[in-house]
Amino acid sequence: FFSSRRRHTRCLSDWSSDVCSSDLDYDFVLIDCPPALSLLTLNGLCAANGVIVPMQCEYFALEGLSDLVNTIKQVHANLNPSLTIIGLLRVMFDPRTTLQQQVSEQLMAHFGDKVFNTIIPRNVRLAEAPSYGMPGVNFDKSSRGAQAYMQFGAEMIQRIKTM
């Protein structure tokens, strides 16, 4: 699979090399990949130094996580040796749901420190923001969801600095 895909993963990887070697002064470049393990996602993994996995605490997401982790390991071994998992971010979380609490506990037990402390709650204001053409953190800065994303941003930066 990976040997036949090697030539298809060069475009974004070449772009990221150009960005890093240019005079542009970026602290971070975020590549938002689709949730499916497609060629687009593979390109993103080849161009990235690290992966943040947003994950709903639900049964099927937990099953898909093992496939994603295996893919990340394969990309690391065959295409991009600098790729690492920065962490897992629990999103759309509803603490009233027993299953979500159980899946969250399983994530913590299996991945430990790789799981970010910040949890992004299920939040109506975040869900409404795209229909107004705005990012959730700008749409309603006082919402629980926006506050959680701001907290996550600070936690992410701190984690990357200590890697």
Which residue stretches match the model-derived regions?
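Conserved catalytic-core segment of NTP-binding enzymes
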Residues: D23-V124
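Single conserved hydrophobic/aromatic residue that forms the stacking wall/gate
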Residues: F1-C20
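Generic C-terminal helix-cap and adjacent flexible tail
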Residues: Q158-M163
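Active-site donor-binding loop signature of nucleotide-sugar glycosyltransferases
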Residues: C11, T118, R122, K141
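C-terminal boundary of histidine-terminating zinc-finger modules
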Residues: P130-Q147
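Short, amphipathic alpha-helical "lid/cap" segments that border enzyme active or binding sites
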Residues: A146-I157
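Nucleotide phosphate-binding site architecture
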Residues: F2, P121, A127, V137
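Soluble or luminal CAZymes and related metallo-dependent hydrolases
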Residues: S17, L99, R144-A148
